[in-house]
């Protein structure tokens, strides 16, 4: 007896389903799900896989997204505790880890998250040996180093979300002061994602007009307009949001999909993201910090050599020393 499906549809071809543009998200907490919905809304993948250790939440999140399939253009949304669901991913986004508590510095989280990564990374490598790894979990610079060490991947394929969000926050706050959309406000925050990030005031501009040329005190203590406070707001903003709503999610999700789009579409846009910067700016250790990187289908193909002041370079070096001080104590 022919089934309804057989009566309706005549099959012409036996297909083997191998995804071409699969994205996996490890961790279905607030950040992971913000990444997931952002990716789905941008139509970046032909398959999205979700992985977590909390099976009920994982299944619930998957079903909730699947029920919206009519409104999406991603034909397959899967999930599982077993990493075999991640097979053949082009991009794996890692958001899993111990959550930052109110008032806790990102660096306090380290060893707890290293232990989690020791389980996650080998499983990803096993099922998607050619993927790009995008690390979002905090402290992101150190955990990108950890992912690089454990995976054995070349450094171009291990990327930290780094200062992409810090720079976005900076441009938003700058735009609010000037009454200009953030897309037209240009400024870069480099170095460590978080407390010791470095604003490059010399490069801040609108329509190619340097703000430092118009206002030489920009970013200094002598500045009567206190533009330095904009960077302080950037540093404090995550703590403030965590204090108010318990965690951050939407902005980091949007920031991550911005990076995912550059990778999946080979856009070769420049982003302030965390990469191995040994040999740059007098840094001699294996540390990952954010510098402007060209991002495309192979991950990070190039870095842009930014002209920094002596003071900015010293801050970057200090960040590197702080991170290395922690990294060399880590138990793998």
UniProtKB/Swiss-Prot annotation:
Which superkingdom, per the lineage?
A: Eukaryota
EC number, as in UniProt: 1.1.1.27
Query: What subcellular locations does the record give?
Result: Cytoplasm
Binding positions for substrate per the UniProt entry? 106, 138, 169, 248
Give the record's pathway: Fermentation; pyruvate fermentation to lactate; (S)-lactate from pyruvate: step 1/1
> Is Transcription regulation among this UniProt entry's keywords?
no
Signal peptide start and end residues: none
Keywords in alphabetical order, please. Acetylation, Cytoplasm, Isopeptide bond, NAD, Oxidoreductase, Phosphoprotein, Ubl conjugation
Which residues are recorded as modified (N-acetylalanine)?
2
Reactions it catalyzes: (S)-lactate + NAD(+) = pyruvate + NADH + H(+)
Q: Which GO terms describe its molecular function?
A: L-lactate dehydrogenase activity
In what way is this protein post-translationally modified?
ISGylated.
- Positions bearing N6-acetyllysine: 5, 14, 57, 81, 118, 126, 224, 232, 243, 318
Broad class of enzyme this protein falls into: oxidoreductase
List positions binding NAD(+).
29-57, 138
Give me the segments passing through the membrane.
Answer: none
Q: Which residues carry this modification: Phosphothreonine?
A: 309, 322
UniProt family annotation: Belongs to the LDH/MDH superfamily. LDH family.
Q: What does this protein do?
A: Interconverts simultaneously and stereospecifically pyruvate and lactate with concomitant interconversion of NADH and NAD(+).
Mind telling me which PANTHER family this protein's record contains? L-2-HYDROXYCARBOXYLATE DEHYDROGENASE (NAD(P)(+)), L-LACTATE DEHYDROGENASE A CHAIN
Q: Give the quaternary structure.
A: Homotetramer. Interacts with PTEN upstream reading frame protein MP31.
Q: In its UniProt entry, what is this protein called?
A: L-lactate dehydrogenase A chain
Q: What is the lineage of its organism?
A: Eukaryota, Metazoa, Chordata, Craniata, Vertebrata
- Which gene name does the record give? LDHA
């Amino acid at each position: 007896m022919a089934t309804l499906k057989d009566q309706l549809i005549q099959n012409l071809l036996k297909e083997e389903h191998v995804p071409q543009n699969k994205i996996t998200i490890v961790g279905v907490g607030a950040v992971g799900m913000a990444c997931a919905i952002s990716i789905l809304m941008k139509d970046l993948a032909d398959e999205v896989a979700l992985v977590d250790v909390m099976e009920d939440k994982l299944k619930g999140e998957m079903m909730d997204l699947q029920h919206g399939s009519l409104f999406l253009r991603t034909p397959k949304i899967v999930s599982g505790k077993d990493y075999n669901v991640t097979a053949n991913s082009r991009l794996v986004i890692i958001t899993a880890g111990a959550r930052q508590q109110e008032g806790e510095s990102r660096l306090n989280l380290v060893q707890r998250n290293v232990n989690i990564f020791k389980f996650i990374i080998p499983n990803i490598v096993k099922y998607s040996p050619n993927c790009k790894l995008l690390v979002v979990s905090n402290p992101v610079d150190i955990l990108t180093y950890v992912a690089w060490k454990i995976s054995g991947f070349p450094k171009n394929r291990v990327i930290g979300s780094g200062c992409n969000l810090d720079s976005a926050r900076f441009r938003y706050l700058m735009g609010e002061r000037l009454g200009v959309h953030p897309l037209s406000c240009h400024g870069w925050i480099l170095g460590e994602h978080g407390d010791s990030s470095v604003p490059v005031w010399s490069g801040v501009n609108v329509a190619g007009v340097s703000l430092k040329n118009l206002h030489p005190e920009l970013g200094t203590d002598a500045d009567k307009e206190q533009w330095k406070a904009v960077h302080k707001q950037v540093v404090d903003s995550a703590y403030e949001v965590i204090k108010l709503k318990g965690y951050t999610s939407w902005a980091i999700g949007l920031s991550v999909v911005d990076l995912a789009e550059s990778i999946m579409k080979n856009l070769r846009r420049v982003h302030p993201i965390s990469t191995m910067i040994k040999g740059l700016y007098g840094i001699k250790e294996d540390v990952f910090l954010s510098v402007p990187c060209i991002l495309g289908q192979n991950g990070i193909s190039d870095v842009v050599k930014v002209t920094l002041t002596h003071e900015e370079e010293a801050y970057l070096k200090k960040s590197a020393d702080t991170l290395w001080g922690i990294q060399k104590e880590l138990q793998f």
